Amino acid sequence: MSTQSTHPLKPEAPRLPPGIPESPSCQRRHTLPASEFRCLTPEDAVSAFEIEREAFISVLGVCPLYLDEIRHFLTLCPELSLGWFEEGCLVAFIIGSLWDKERLMQESLTLHRSGGHIAHLHVLAVHRAFRQQGRGPILLWRYLHHLGSQPAVRRAALMCEDALVPFYERFSFHAVGPCAITVGSLTFMELHCSLRGHPFLRRNSGC
């Protein structure tokens, strides 16, 4: 379940506007790179959940992942996550896990199948202070490159609302039909993206 051509950028590091508290993952700024992409760790879970909760609760009334589920995936498969940090603060992230069936199912919301070859993208979220800056597309582009560097991952899959399908189609995702997963009264479209046959996706994102 997710939110937002691009090339990897090295943007200037914007600062959080006055009145917006820093994420718990922030560290001393003078020792940190201005802009950094890296895989998340369980220590980033609280920061990720705060961003996700604000992004999704007001729109959908639910979160794709709750705090214990974020910790679960960042413990089992941190290599399937990617965070964008500005001066040590998490500002955007993607969390995924492996799946071993042709299509997503209800249990794929909470399971990581270590022998699977499909990366299930659970959530893409951007901090409210950094939206409308093109960060979602840049992060997704970097994430697909990162997945492409992992030989076991052959395909990416996600579920989203119909209105977001055109956004993901820009990244070579294609709709395969309605998703079997429902959340309350919400229904979703399932999208897949092959990581084979796309050489530009095989570059390492440096995560």
Curated annotation (Swiss-Prot):
Residues 1-28 are annotated as: Disordered. Its EC number is 2.3.1.87. It catalyses: a 2-arylethylamine + acetyl-CoA = an N-acetyl-2-arylethylamine + CoA + H(+). It comes from the Eukaryota. Gene3D superfamilies: 3.40.630.30. Transmembrane segments: none annotated. Highly expressed in pineal gland and at lower levels in the retina. Weak expression in several brain regions and in the pituitary gland. PANTHER family: SEROTONIN N-ACETYLTRANSFERASE. This is Serotonin N-acetyltransferase.
